[in-house]
A protein has these predicted regions:
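Helix N-terminus capping/helix-initiation residues
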Residues: 82, 86-87, 104, 274, ...
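Low-complexity, intrinsically disordered extramembrane tails and loops of integral membrane proteins
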Residues: 1-16, 113-116, 256, 260-261, ...
Length: 301
């Protein structure tokens, strides 16, 4: 294998690619640590169902209360896990969420030209949708079945290399695992502003009242915020290895030199030291090591 991997990770290196199969154990751990949250969710939906049916009908519907929690909580976990098969709508959702737009005719032509310049015979998946993000950084991302490319990439000489790297993510489990993990964490991220504001208010000595305290108890118990935070460094370790794998894929498409130059001229200058990186959510490895690995591909021919 060309160049050693960044050793600052506890995940394994396998012959099929850096960390390719590690997502299985990570996802199972992510689900397992959410079991207490799932139990709290079941209990909460059970009590709320009894309360609402009591108010509406004059008596609690125990039959509905015994069934509905399993439908709601089970549906949530099934929805998250379904992304491992088909991350339906993930690309459009993120594109809308960050303000990406449809490409102009000129941008669409540039994308087709860059893609057609790659040897695509062995490529199994291509993005079905293209979005453009009006930002100055030279960057791109693939989410679901969509690729989102920053506008300035279209004016650069590195577009084919950037696309080749993103194809590496698309033609592996990266995109689907990322979507599934994000869905598992969606309740935590959705409620994070509320939880943070409440914590800050309490630290400042504000009296929030018993009712708000009960609401926040339910929110905290159902969101899985602590578990999501615990899993962050583990997922980041996996992603650092997957960035190497996507670089390898781009090298396999003949873009090793171009991608190395892209990193050397546009990315490495912005790297900063990350203390105890295995304890952080830093998802990209040091750029210098990525450049070294890509150039080792060239030396091997």
């Amino acid at each position: 294998m060309p160049a050693d991997l960044d050793p600052r990770t506890w995940l394994s290196f396998e012959t099929r690619g850096p960390g390719e199969r590690d997502w299985v154990k990570l996802y199972l751990i992510a689900v397992a640590v959410l079991i207490p949250t799932a139990i709290f969710q079941l209990f909460t939906v059970f009590l709320l169902t009894l309360l609402f049916t009591l108010i509406a009908n004059g008596h609690g519907d125990s039959g509905l209360a015994n069934v509905l929690p399993w439908i709601v909580v089970g549906g949530y976990f099934a929805w998250a896990t379904s992304a491992l098969i088909v991350p339906l709508g993930a690309g459009r959702y993120l594109a809308d969420g960050i303000g990406a737009r449809r490409p102009t005719a000129e941008e669409a032509d540039a994308y087709r030209d860059a893609t057609s310049s790659l040897p695509l015979d062995g490529v199994k998946r291509l993005p079905k949708s293209l979005y453009v993000l009006d930002r100055h950084e030279l960057n791109a991302a693939v989410v679901g079945d969509a690729v989102i490319i920053n506008r300035t990439v279209f004016d650069s000489e590195y577009m084919a290399a950037v696309i080749a790297h993103e194809l590496g993510h698309l033609n592996s489990m990266d995109v689907r695992v990322s979507c599934a993990a994000n869905r598992l964490a969606s309740l935590a991220r959705l409620t994070e502003p509320m939880r943070t504001q409440t914590t800050e208010a309490r630290r400042s000595g504000q009296q929030l009242g018993c009712l708000w305290g009960l609401v926040m108890l339910i929110v905290r118990g159902c969101s899985g915020g602590l578990q999501t935070t615990m899993m962050g460094p583990a997922w980041a370790s996996w992603w650092r290895l997957r960035e190497y794998a996507a670089d390898d894929y781009a090298a396999g498409l003949g873009q090793a030199e171009e991608l190395a130059r892209f990193f050397d001229e546009n990315v490495v200058l912005y790297d900063v030291p990350i203390r105890f990186v295995w304890m952080t959510t830093q998802s990209h490895p040091p750029t210098a090591l990525r450049i070294e690995r890509l150039r080792a591909h060239l030396e091997r021919g």
